[in-house]
Amino acid sequence: MNKKTDITLVGFAVNPEAAGKDNKYYNFLDSIGAKFLYNKFFDTYTTEPMALLHIAAQLKNANFNVEVIDGIIESLSKEKLIERLLQSSSDVYAFTLYDTSEEDIIDIMKEVKKHKPNAVIMTGGPYPTMEYEKILKKYDVIDYITIGDGDKVYINYLNAINNNESLSSVKNLAYRDELGNIQITEREVVDLDEQVPTDRMFAQQVIDKGFSLGVNTSRGCAHASCSFCYLKDYQTVSCQPRIRYRSPENVVNEVKDLIDRFHIDKITFCDDDFFGTNIEGLKRACDIFELLIKNNIKMDIYVIGRVKTMQYMIEHDMLPLMKQAGVSCVYLGFDSYNDDILKRYQKGCTVSDINTVVNALHENGIRINPGLITFEPVLNIDHVKNNIELFKILGYYDAYMFTRVLVILPQMRKKYFNDEELDIYDDEYFKDSQTKRLFEELSKYRDMVLPLYRLIVRNEITEDVRQYLYAEHYNFFDYVYNNLKQNKEFDTEQYILECKSRILEQIKPICESEYCDDRKKGYTLQRKIKN
């Protein structure tokens, strides 16, 4: 007889509309590859649900029976996810909750509660931490919210329930008391070196698709100064320091273990800020690099950093060490390629600084994955044009980059935009009508081209085909931008149909389908039936 599950950890994709999808549920891992056209950037993507897997590891280490159901990596529809949850033997369900997917997640919680009235519903993460009072007042279906670090909360909660102890002893927990008043317990932060390594239950699936496994080497951001970022508020509520580090030895030991277990040749250090402060943080980063070299670990390494940090490393000649250690790609939070917007974002750098960093990294053979906010409420079309130009300079492409939008958490709306109701789905999100039109037209192109990209066989796409598809996308942007700039009347429907026809013709030899028949209402695929 199977042992009863003590707790089920649940992840689910953000609302499909937020990712520019068409309300269909595609295989998540396959969809990512298509989005990047299987180029040199897609394998840096970390697809493991790291937070869920890390908490699962701590629970297992404390001898609890844990189930992880992740709607994203398992490509579950809302209905399929509910079906899986109702089949679980658990009475405790801990959900991830995002502002962008709140409605869907709450619906799922209600379905669980409807069929299992005695089930305990918990949630956590940055958004619930910052908005715990509002969420507990609004949703009776949620019983508890973890505040900040969740590593020990679920262990301590289960122990308290099993031992009939007061929940006031469980740190980092918000809940309603017997009178309905919201209580929050004492906050604590965990020592990262004391945590057991992340569970890797999805590792082989991720590796087989060509993606990188992820390793968290720190928590937080040493700077947390970007004006639109939630992190400072999150850390205030959860009483966390700006940044915490794992020791270099601890990090490299996990890397060695992953190499031994999975024979990997690439890894992503998926911190918010791998390098941290310019003194302590960079010393730790260099110590990690030196340990990797000392242990003769040869692999592609992907890290996340800031423009200001890269400037410091350039000035102190640290890039050669980083390259020698195996760093082949750096994700940099540029956020904008406009001086006025960089100032407004409080980035502490200029377009000239960005150019210096880009040139230095490229000279050292390190490619750049750009963190760039293509659209947000106050941008005009020239701001957007400059952002697109940076993508071009970097040689970067993914199908979503033309329609990236700043998702604004509730507590940032009033502070940053003086608009408490601002939402990415509202007609009034964009303050400039031309910017709104540009975004809408680019969204139409994206939604046309993504289903076509999904037809492409990964191993058969060539660099020439990629460059052709990149050029079509850039040309469409230029077409819309130039018409808007000249205040011309235009309709993209026919232009998009013509692009679609050209793309179908170009990719037909490398598609999974036997042929693509372009019809009035789209295309029909006649797939080969393989024995």
Q: Which residues does each PLM region occupy?
A:
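Flexible glycine/acidic-rich beta-alpha junction loops that bind and position SAM and/or redox cofactors
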Residues: 16-19, 132, 278-279, 340, ...
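N-terminal [4Fe-4S]-dependent radical SAM core
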Residues: 19-21, 170, 176-218, 515
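Residue-level recognition of beta-strand->loop/alpha-helix junctions
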Residues: 69-72, 96, 233, 333, ...
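Structural recognition of alpha->loop->beta junctions
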Residues: 134-152, 318-330, 386-404
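Radical SAM [4Fe-4S] cluster-binding motif and immediate context
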Residues: 193-368, 376, 389
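A solvent-exposed, charged loop/short amphipathic helix patch at secondary-structure junctions
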Residues: 20-42
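Radical SAM enzyme core and accessory elements
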Residues: 1-9, 16-26, 82, 86, ...
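Glycine-rich beta-alpha loop elements in corrinoid/cobalamin-binding modules
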Residues: 51, 55-186, 411
